[in-house]
Amino acid sequence: MPTSAKNPDNVKHENAVFHVHGVTKIYQMGEVQVRALRGIDLDLYKGELVVMLGASGSGKSTLLNILGGLDSPTEGRVQYAGGDLTRASEKELTAYRRYHVGFVFQFYNLIPSLTALENIAVVTEISKTPMQPEEALKLVDLGDRLHHFPAQLSGGEQQRVAIARAIAKNPDVLLCDEPTGALDSKTGIVVLEALQRVNQELGTTTAVITHNASIAQMADRVIHLADGRISQVDVNETKLDPSQLSW
């Protein structure tokens, strides 16, 4: 092989937003060790929408927290955009979470005394290159709910405000932990449509973790987790629109 040629695997790693290699996570519970992750190898690529699918206890939330800089692996390496998160200082991790990652959780965590617009502004005021709060809310189809308080919004609308809050700082990556877990299927589909719109229109690399296998059909790739390991990776050659999903 000529010295100028590149190994295809190395090229793939170079194009990855995240490169995860040999990641293990062990929690010490008294005298008992709990292995949440066991030797995870994974690349995530710019602009793709990935669903991480697994039952409760499969390790998917732990993996998402490590990708988001909320937790660190016991062993292994996590690289983001070429930088090593596993060697980052707490100050560097804080900057990473603040400027590069948007989080969406199962529960919305909106500030009850602030309107939808004001909940978004809390984030944009501390961001480097934020969207206008109105623009973020319009992107999730809530342009007519700008001045409503959380108590005046349905569960699905509150979750869409949470998505708007996450994307308003213009993150490179959107990490979603069971974003439809507290919603009925009809409302959940509206939330998934908002996530799809963000992924397609902004090009935000998006990872959604869920136990709901139906959601996997809208993803570019599906990462199956079981017992702390990646058991299977599927590529959807033909993706379904969220409106075509049912559960």
Model-derived features: where do they sit?
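ABC family nucleotide-binding domain
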Residues: 16-225, 230
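ABC-family P-loop ATPase nucleotide-binding domain
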Residues: 1-26, 232-247
